[in-house]
Amino acid sequence: NCFLSSTNKILIGDNVAVTEHTVILDNIHGDFRDNHLTFNENPDVPDVFLQEIKDRPLASKGPVVIEDSVHIGMFCTILPGTKIGHHSIIAAHSVVGRKIPPYSLVAGNPAQIVVTFGKKNNSI
């Protein structure tokens, strides 16, 4: 129950756990342009804009690199250009969009480092 989308490269190391409902992307659907925006005209639905993405090609924003012995919790999103260092833990529901150093526990949206642990303590 995971979703991976790649137009460039997604590298996943050894002993990596990717749990349910995780999304890993190395691309986006191009730029938003004013002439592609439409607005919801149904008065029963809150005002939200609808973006037609079917006509916008996928564009690479850099590879995703997940090094060895990483654990990615449920419902995470790994964004283009992300590098996750070895022995790191990504907490459930986190959104990661930057470089994460090895031996890090990150959580949140956007993901922030909660703690960095040493090689001797990598059994968190």
Give the ranges of each region predicted by the language model.
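Flexible, glycine/small-residue-enriched loop-and-beta-strand segment within the central core
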Residues: 1-82, 117-118
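C-terminal/domain-terminus segments
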Residues: 72-112, 120-124
